[in-house]
Amino acid sequence: MSQEAILEKVRSIVAEQLSVDAGEVKPESNFQNDLGADSLDTVELVMALEEAFDIEIPDESAEGILTVGDAVKYIEDKQA
């Protein structure tokens, strides 16, 4: 899956999970600061990404995923 395809899928999931417009979801968007996620939202978002991409994101890794771009990079690395 290309980086662009991953970004589009992540953007769609983030928009749905956080009830924000997909146009607001950019690679540099911080889940908490820019998109208004709280800690529970972040946990639910990680679970949604795990399911959508059929990967596991350990808690230690999830703590380092702060932006949409971080999520895309992590998923891209896992699928390589």
From Swiss-Prot:
One of the entry's Gene Ontology molecular-function terms is: acyl carrier activity
Q: Which UniProt keywords apply?
A: Cytoplasm, Fatty acid biosynthesis, Fatty acid metabolism, Lipid biosynthesis, Lipid metabolism, Phosphopantetheine, Phosphoprotein
What is the annotated localization of this protein?
A: Cytoplasm
**GO CC annotations on file:** cytosol; membrane
Which sequence positions carry the modification called O-(pantetheine 4'-phosphoryl)serine?
A: S39
Q: Which InterPro entries does UniProt cross-reference here?
A: ACP, ACP-like_sf, PP-bd_ACP, Ppantetheine_attach_site
Q: Which Pfam families does the record cross-reference, listed alphabetically?
A: PP-binding
Record's family? Belongs to the acyl carrier protein (ACP) family.
Summarizing the function annotation, the protein's role is: Carrier of the growing fatty acid chain in fatty acid biosynthesis.
Tell me what this protein is called.
Acyl carrier protein
